[in-house]
Curated annotation (Swiss-Prot):
Statement: the UniProt record of this protein carries the keyword Transmembrane helix: yes
Gene3D superfamilies linked: Large-conductance mechanosensitive channel, MscL, domain 1
SUPFAM superfamilies registered for this protein in UniProt: Gated mechanosensitive channel (SSF81330)
Cellular localisation: Cell membrane
Organism, as annotated: Geobacillus kaustophilus (strain HTA426)
Key words, A-Z: Cell membrane, Ion channel, Ion transport, Membrane, Transmembrane, Transmembrane helix, Transport
Ranges that cross the membrane: 8-28, 30-50, 67-87
Any single Gene Ontology cellular-component annotation: plasma membrane
GO MF entry, a single one: mechanosensitive monoatomic ion channel activity
Protein name (record): Large-conductance mechanosensitive channel
HAMAP family per record: MscL
Its biological purpose: Channel that opens in response to stretch forces in the membrane lipid bilayer. May participate in the regulation of osmotic pressure changes within the cell.
InterPro entries in alphabetical order: Mechanosensitive_channel_CS, MS_channel, MSC/AndL, MscL_channel
Length: 131
């Protein structure tokens, strides 16, 4: 059982996923800071000094914090757009590599024998044309 677990844990997909989760978490913190500390205060200033995180409705004893929700939505949109751009970049690079491989595959590579036979054929053609 231990060996199976080691094989599972060491496989590339699991390690890639772990790295992605860690980097994604760190990226999420950066984007949250961007939204909370830079974007939303500027939007609040433009709209007359509103602090979005303080916006809420009180319904009885319950408090609906729609300002925090707005910040979370902006946070999500920035993260989603960043991921979209990253995936688009990766797909573009993948397509370029794929096209380069297709070009390499379409160009026939001749063996030594084929090259020699081609040279002999060309020489024979030249001899016939000159005579």
């Amino acid at each position: 059982m231990w060996n199976e677990f080691k094989k599972f844990a060491i496989r590339g997909n699991v390690i890639d996923l772990a790295v992605g989760v860690i980097i994604g978490g760190a990226f999420g913190k950066i984007v949250s800071s961007l939204v909370n500390d830079i974007i939303m205060p500027l939007v609040g200033l433009i709209l007359g000094g509103i602090n979005f995180s303080d916006l809420s409705w009180k319904v009885g004893k319950a408090e609906v914090k729609y300002g925090a929700f707005i910040q979370t939505v902006v946070d999500f949109l920035i993260i989603a757009f960043s991921i979209f751009l990253f995936v688009k970049l990766i797909n573009t690079l993948y397509e370029r590599v794929k096209k380069q491989e297709e070009v390499k595959e379409t160009a026939p590579t001749l063996t030594k024998e084929e090259e020699l036979l081609t040279e002999i054929r060309d020489l024979l053609k030249q001899q016939r044309e000159t005579t």
